[in-house]
Structures are given as structure tokens and as C-alpha cells.
């Protein structure tokens, strides 16, 4: 692990904030525990891509936009990650995902499904989803580390694989050697290798699909 503190106004208050530290550590502890190498960059909050690019411009990695959506009934949730310079309107998204009418998920749903607030949506939030899979009756497997299921989960909200979230990923990320996401808080960015990202998805164990986004 490599940690770098970037210049920025008021950066110290974010580094010293215990809640921010806990959210970030939840991700970095998981990566370290599972042998996924990463670089951690601390910076002021980056709530928009425009602001983020000011800090990302000198970091060698593919940086991403991340959306969290729900279906019309509100019983299915979708995470979408794609290269940050691309634009994707909701009608195009509905066509590509083939999941019916979609809308942006509320902050309450973000917290429940990914453990994040608006502006910090990230695939690393799928750690929150790891403890939702329902084991077979005779299974003695322990729940994954660092899982904190906040409330009971209705079976109707789960996909067939026992997870609440389906993940759609920009297929161009397959070609990226290094990929950057927030570690569940927008005061930091984590860079992992393509192989590390794929290993993370395997550990998550949910359903993901590569999609073309122009």
C-alpha cells in the first residue's frame, strides 16, 4: 500500500475525521486482507467529476463515474461504472441495461445497499453487499470480513445469487491497467490494477456485466 496526501485547503480536517477514517479503512482493510495492492490518495472532497479532475489529472489511472439506480418498483438496484469523460443519459442507460424504467436511487438506498452518501458512490461499496447472500442450509461458511448489514433484507429485493445489487461495468475498463475509485468517501481515491479490480469483483461474488458505453 502507498498513501499520499495531496495538497488542498482544509485537508487536515478530513484526514483527522474519525468517521471518514473509518469508511476509508473499511475498504483498505478489506483490500489488504485479500492481497489486493493499491495506492491511496487523500484530498479534499470531490463531489463532482469537474472538481475531481483537478486532482486526478496527474494520477496515472482510468478514473470513473459511478451511478446508483433503482428500477420502477424499487426492488432492484444497479451500480454502473464507466470512464469519467463519457456521458450517459438515463434513456440510453435504460436501453443498454434492459431493466425497464430506471431512476436515481435515494440517499437512504445508497446507505442501505452500498454504505455511501451521494458523491461517494463506488464499486468498493459492494463490500456492504457481501453479507447479504443467503447460504445453503448446510453451509458452515462464515460471513465475509467487514460486513455490517444495517437491517433485515426482504427476499424480494435480492437477485437470484443472493445479492441486492447488480453491477454494470464499462467494457473499456478491461483495457485499463490501473483503475481509480473513491473508497466509500470522496475525500480519497484508491487506485488498483485491472487484476486487483477483477479479484475484488470475484470476492464480492455478485452478478456483473460488461457493457459498451461510447
Task: Walk through the language-model features, giving the residues of each.
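Extended, low-hydrophobicity, polar/charged segments
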Residues: 1-214
